[in-house]
Amino acid sequence: MVVTNQAGVARGYYGEEDVKNLHVYMNHILECMGASIDAFYYCPHHPEHGIGPYKKECSCRKPGTGMFEEAAQRFEVDKAHSFMIGDKLLDVEAGNNYGLTTILVGTGYGSGIRSQEEKEGIPPVYDFYAEDLVKAAQWIIEKGQADVR
């Protein structure tokens, strides 16, 4: 599943249909490679910079857990064996708030966050750091195999 804040909708940069079309396109690309994403959840709101009905406080916007809760109503989510992977501390905070194992990836903003933490001696608030999604997936698979033993 994908959970994503889409403040661009709230700010009027693009519409909800654009977000949905991107998700369809992403799944099409993945399906061509034998994979798929079961569901996409997005928050179109922003508490300060939203326009019209999109300017509001909500439980769906990460670090809130509304999108996770919505997914849990549709799917059987086993928190003990589920992961939140993201490139921002907001993603990690959302996963922590919902009780998931969290992974910060170095793509996007993640490597800068990691560098700053190391430079300033800040302890990580995530469970694992991975350079990219492939390394995150490998760690998840290894962790799963260790849990089975």
Where are the regions a protein language model picked out?
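A short secondary-structure junction motif
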Residues: 6-19
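Structural recognition of the conserved hydrophobic beta-strand(s) that form the central parallel beta-sheet
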Residues: 1-3
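Asp-based, Mg2+/Mn2+-dependent phosphohydrolase catalytic module
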Residues: 16-39, 47-84, 88-149
